[in-house]
């Protein structure tokens, strides 16, 4: 019953005259009165099946009962299509299969949406019937690419001498980073495991163990607010290695990405990738993950305007802030006052109090703020911004962080709106020279910019107590087309530096020992210098497959509210289960 000679999408002219046996789903059925045509679909494509009384009356009778999405077993002869019947849009469009036998393996209800790449249905419906959504060819191709990417990574790392090692899913909760997903212990009442946010500590312990080269296609879990490129459970390519410098690690990852791009996209990319310091990325692009496929770089005018007649600019600089601008080439006529008002509202979302603007005309700068600048100041501004007639100049004056956030976001919006981005290009970039700490003004304390195990630049260690904000990290992020693919660093491997790190982050000695004592003790048994990286597999596939949503690269994803519409998880559990776990649920309001 289950013998198959060909896949549907692979029946070609070479098979003309042969008897083939196919399996698949009914994509479309057409009854032309005496003849029935069925498009049979499997994961490789579609082939046309013809049911004719001249070939088999029995098969034709069965075909009369067939409907969309029925699963069929068809045996027939491959025939050249008649002239005028060729379908140039199908790889199998020059042939058809004349059915001699057909068996209905499974019937189907009418699906809630058309199984087609062009289907127009809400994402909620697609996620509720995900098993139907995954039948669409575009979805299968995405997951085929995911498989190719994962295999290319595994093959490369195997050739480089890495071992794939699985680390625990049930582990210890730590307060740093995002919220943990907690798992109550039945055996230890009142105590909890946490699902891992990453295998970070375990992979470092594998370096202490002498494994030297480790990797894992790791499942990770973070209970954080979601957006289009975030999921509560995700997959990362987790890599750790001993006795390699930062340059060694970056060069190896570049070779790995070149392999991935060749396998998955058939393109050769140039290595080494460009490198840019964190400070330079913020200064030029207003972002630590800049999209370098287009220009519109930020230009600092603070020094030029600190004494100008426009008080908004002058006071911003005098109060320790910045004035930066973007020159939107040739856009003066493309943006009306109403359009600029919309841009002003847009930057307000990022904290900007306003968006100043000028248009470059043949006789000089025109706009609401032009009158505040002398002729010499206008000339100097135009020279700095390389402004020409027809350009639109957009300014934000505020705290440095607000200027970066607002103009960085505006730059991306303008790039998309003006179609300045080459969507076929792949621009990889390393961001290096990160700060080790970030200061949270609301909580009045420092956080690790990456994580608490990142090695500082050695000469900066004495600044832990005197000037933490100036301590540099031996850390690096890999960026692709404006998305952070992942981050890594050299790791702390000496107990005294790790203890100083915990102290700067606000841990008491007792807290550090309680949460990380096993790691601190391990560092006393001969720890090699080591480092690594973690790359987001879901996000990498999203970019390579040209998908706009991370959920399209995960077989059974969660919604923005971290729920599964297919299984209706999360869900309530029985009182008996709660009793076993020694838990009681407080009165809570259900979140829609």
Curated annotation (Swiss-Prot):
Source species taxonomy: Bacteria, Bacillati, Bacillota, Bacilli, Bacillales
Gene: aspS
Function as written in the Swiss-Prot or TrEMBL entry: Aspartyl-tRNA synthetase with relaxed tRNA specificity since it is able to aspartylate not only its cognate tRNA(Asp) but also tRNA(Asn). Reaction proceeds in two steps: L-aspartate is first activated by ATP to form Asp-AMP and then transferred to the acceptor end of tRNA(Asp/Asn).
Source organism of this protein record: Anoxybacillus flavithermus (strain DSM 21510 / WK1)
Protein name in the entry: Aspartate--tRNA(Asp/Asn) ligase
Chain residues that bind L-aspartate: 176, 222, 450, 491
Amino-acid positions noted as binding ATP in the UniProt annotation, renumbered to this chain: 222-224, 231, 484, 536-539
PANTHER family assigned: ASPARTATE--TRNA LIGASE, MITOCHONDRIAL (PTHR22594:SF5), ASPARTYL/LYSYL-TRNA SYNTHETASE (PTHR22594)
Subcellular location, principal: cytoplasm
Subcellular location(s) of the protein: Cytoplasm
